């Protein structure tokens, strides 16, 4: 089996015990299986939930707290307990772990996004196993973030993973809730996430987690768009993750055909960047960009909205108001208003610029 880069996401329901916080038995089972992946020569990243579940009992809560302050207090206590438990278990296999706590802002800010990419790459080059969690104790987003499901998809795209394995307490995707419907049909393989499939998932999570099957389907759709195939399911024992790679996993495989990888900069533009303005373009420019993969030139710009600086991300729309994509603009809004509709040779005659693309195709994402 060739070396692969694997992101494994373990949810609260697959890790925690409702009475004791962290289930040592379940955690040991996961670590043993992750160690087997490493033993087979694969690069492994772990996205783990469970900080809130690990910490609430230590603070004297009888069950998972429902208030924001309670959840964040439990996470502040639980994150250190969770990481300590992982570190001790992985040490038995001679595996060095590294902790990364991320928030949504780490993805939306380009410099921090690039730093996360560089750090993860260096850790993998050094054979460490990164353990990643949302920074629950300060981030409100995590509490409605889908139990780290979307985080796992975004990380898998960032590191150009070969596969994302989302482990939960349900063995795959069904056309109905299998706990309530005996005739529920299981999907063993889905080539893509269609609107029909997305509509089948409910919103409810487990008692310990915040993410239901809907968040997992949304995460799978995002991962596929980034060139990463997905497995959603469950399992026990040391071979469970290796079995997934062999096609023997107890769950649903989603889009396991080779996917087209999206480069890091385009991932940031597509999924994380903040839109600072809008550019309206004519039909000829829209055709050149969408059908022929060309860069956007000033001649095709008909209107500029907003106040943005060089390098900021803008939406591009047709004269009919349809948004066709977004990209990093090489002009400020003020500069672009001055040259919109002008041919490149006329701008060149001014002697003001060396580059004339408004948005270069390498910094463009179609929507």
UniProtKB/Swiss-Prot annotation:
Subcellular location: Cytoplasm
Binding site for substrate: 49, 136, 148
Catalytic activity: L-glutamate + ATP = L-glutamyl 5-phosphate + ADP
Annotated signal peptide: none
Biological-process GO terms, alphabetical: L-proline biosynthetic process
Residue span(s) of domain PUA: 276-350
Pfam family, one: AA_kinase
Pathway(s) it belongs to: Amino-acid biosynthesis; L-proline biosynthesis; L-glutamate 5-semialdehyde from L-glutamate: step 1/2
EC number(s) recorded for this UniProt protein: 2.7.2.11
Keyword Cell membrane: no
Main localization of the protein described in the UniProt heading: cytoplasm
Any one GO MF annotation of this record: RNA binding
InterPro entries: AceGlu_kinase-like_sf (IPR036393), Asp/Glu/Uridylate_kinase (IPR001048), G5K_ProB (IPR041739), Glu/AcGlu_kinase (IPR001057), Glu_5kinase (IPR011529), Glu_5kinase/COase_Synthase (IPR005715), Glutamate_5-kinase_CS (IPR019797), PUA (IPR002478)
Domain of life (superkingdom): Bacteria
Binding site for ATP: 9, 168-169, 210-216
Gene Ontology annotations for the cellular component aspect, listed alphabetically: cytosol
Keywords tagged on the record: Amino-acid biosynthesis, ATP-binding, Cytoplasm, Kinase, Nucleotide-binding, Proline biosynthesis, Transferase
Function: Catalyzes the transfer of a phosphate group to glutamate to form L-glutamate 5-phosphate.
Similarity annotation: Belongs to the glutamate 5-kinase family.
Protein name in UniProt: Glutamate 5-kinase
């Amino acid at each position: 089996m060739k070396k692969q880069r694997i992101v494994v996401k373990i949810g609260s329901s697959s890790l925690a015990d409702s009475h004791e916080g962290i289930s040592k038995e379940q955690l040991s089972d996961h670590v043993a299986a992750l160690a087997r992946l490493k033993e087979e020569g694969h690069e492994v990243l772990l996205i783990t939930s469970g900080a809130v579940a690990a910490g609430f009992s230590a603070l004297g809560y009888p069950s998972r707290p429902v208030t924001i302050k309670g959840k964040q207090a439990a996470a502040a206590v639980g994150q250190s307990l969770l990481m300590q438990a992982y570190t001790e278990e992985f040490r038995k296999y001679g595996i060095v772990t590294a902790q990364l706590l991320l928030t949504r802002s780490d993805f939306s800010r380009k410099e921090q996004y690039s730093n996360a990419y560089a750090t993860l790459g260096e850790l993998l080059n050094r054979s460490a196993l990164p353990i990643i969690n949302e920074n629950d104790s300060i981030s409100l987003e995590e509490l409605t973030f889908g139990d780290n499901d979307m985080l796992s998809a975004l990380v898998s795209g960032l590191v150009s993973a070969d596969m994302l394995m989302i482990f939960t307490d349900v063995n795959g995707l069904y056309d109905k809730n299998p706990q309530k419907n005996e005739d529920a049909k299981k999907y063993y393989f889905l080539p893509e996430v269609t609107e029909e499939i997305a509509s089948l998932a409910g919103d409810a999570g487990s008692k310990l987690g915040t993410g239901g099957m809907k968040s997992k389907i949304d995460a799978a759709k995002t991962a596929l768009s980034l060139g990463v195939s997905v497995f959603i399911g469950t399992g026990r024992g040391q071979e469970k993750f290796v079995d997934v790679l062999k096609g023997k996993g107890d769950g649903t495989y989603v889009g396991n055909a080779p996917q087209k990888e999206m480069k890091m900069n385009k991932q940031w533009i597509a999924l994380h960047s903040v839109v600072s303005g809008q550019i309206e373009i004519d039909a000829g420019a829209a055709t050149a960009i969408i059908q022929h993969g060309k860069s956007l030139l000033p001649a095709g710009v008909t209107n500029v909205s907003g106040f943005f600086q060089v390098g900021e991300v803008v939406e591009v729309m047709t004269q009919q108001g349809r948004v066709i994509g977004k990209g990093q603009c090489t002009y400020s809004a003020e500069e672009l208003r001055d040259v919109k509709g002008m041919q490149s040779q006329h701008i060149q005659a001014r002697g003001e610029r060396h580059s004339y693309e408004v948005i270069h195709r390498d910094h463009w994402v179609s929507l």
